[in-house]
Amino acid sequence: EILLDDARRLHEKLLASGCKSRLHIAPERWHAYVLYNLSENMEQDFSEINRFLTKVLSPAKSLRWMRLDNAAKIYPAAKRRNWTNFFRLSATLTEPVDTDVLRTALDVTVRRFPSIAVRLRRGVFWYYLEEISKAPAIEEDKSYPLVHVPFDDVRRCAFRVLVYKNRLAVEFFHAVTDGTGGLIFLKTLTAEYLSQKYGIQIPAERGVLGRLEDPDPEELEDSFLRYAGQITASRKEQTAYHLSGTPEPDGFLDLTTLMLPVDAVKAKAKEFGVSVTEFIAAVMMKAISDLQTEKVPRRMRRRPVKVLLPVNLRGLFPSRTLRNFASYVTPEIDPRLGDYSLAEICKIVHYRMGLENDARMMTAKIATNVASERSAVLRAMPLFIKNIAMKAVFDLVGECKSCLCLSNLGLVQLPDAMAPYVARMDFIIGVQAKAPHNCGVVSWDGTMYINMIRNIREPELESHFYRVLHTLGLPVKVESNQRWT
């Protein structure tokens, strides 16, 4: 359906080119339909239609650009030659993914997410994001997740879509979005794919956005700037125990997935009087503590055990942004003071989360980061000097302050029409620049998937983590891509 004058011109051109065409004019309307049949080898037909669609219906528009949000500014500066901060979300479907259908679904979806369908651009004073003009090519998934993405590729597109059999995966550069925003993108892409593939109607609910709607301006905002408080928080923290091992020489990432019944984990967490996230964090801290005890027999040489727990700030503030909007809490124990039981660690994690996972505390943390961004000295620095300064800050107060990051996206909810087509969900966060482990958690359809990734050969932490869960009587299934030599 197009404007009448345009329809008439297209109709006449199609007839002149030898096509069969009929013009249907809507009564008392300025619109019409053009029905046409193309003959074989009618290249001129296609060129005329393509010209009409691209030049008249979809004229070229200037590409949108956005400043990096407050949390994102550190990621381009912190990059290494063989490391960029990516994370992965994937949906395993009940049938093999049709890449042709997925390609058209991706074309629709990227237009709905102008803050994610972007590339990283370099300015004089800051990096910034620029909307991409078309969707990236769909790639075949590799033998392991989160294969290193060269920084030049991020400058072309800051996310990638990968397919392997039934699995549809999206990997995001962390400067673009966080786990919550990435999950909304994956849900919406999967919904559009299923709609096109099976002709089902999937409503815009439970994290699926309306694919043909215009983006809401609130989805594009930097919510850190909006909710920064007046009082700043201290960044002073002790350096944590550093996990180590034999690096994989070719950059291979070993992935171990532990699968547990959600109900069993909830029941066990309730026994300890903590939430599911607090329970999993306590188990991880217990595993790290046990591993350090083995490796460092002398108690006074041990370092604090700390796990960084991301907090989705959308739960504390009324934000709808699809960009980064998360902070963190870092519970810790100090093994030099003595041994800790799992119950004691659960109590420490619970009270630390209760103290810091609070809107007032978080506004102070946000204010600390925003104050740095607003510094007149930093703003005046050329980008190449900023990169040096920000990388030094990242090394000083970033990853060395925790053993690893444990991020739990919680229980995934999907529209009822969509759920029967999804067999599994996974969330994997890349290893840190200077630490060999990280852990992503997500639950779907009664199963919790704990994805532990590492860039060293020894699966020592995974073994200790499994041992703690097994000792508690929890049924655990394990799968791994580890190479046996």
What are these regions (language model features)?
Residues 2-9:
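Conserved alpha/beta-hydrolase "acid-adjacent" motif
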Residues 15-32:
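Catalytic histidine neighborhood in serine/cysteine hydrolases
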Residues 34-59:
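Catalytic active-site module of serine/aspartate enzymes centered on a nucleophile-bearing elbow/loop
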Residues 59-218, 265-270, 275-297, 400, ...:
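Non-catalytic N-terminal regions of enzymes
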Residues 80, 190, 304-310, 353:
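Long, Pro/Ser/Thr-rich low-complexity/intrinsically disordered regulatory tracts in eukaryotic proteins
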Residues 221-274:
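Flexible, P/S/T/G-rich "lid" or insertion loops adjacent to the active sites of thioester-utilizing
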Residues 255, 324-412, 417:
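Helical lid/core segments from catalytic subdomains that handle acyl or acyl-like groups
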Residues 255-338, 343-347:
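Long, internal scaffold/assembly segments composed of regular secondary structure
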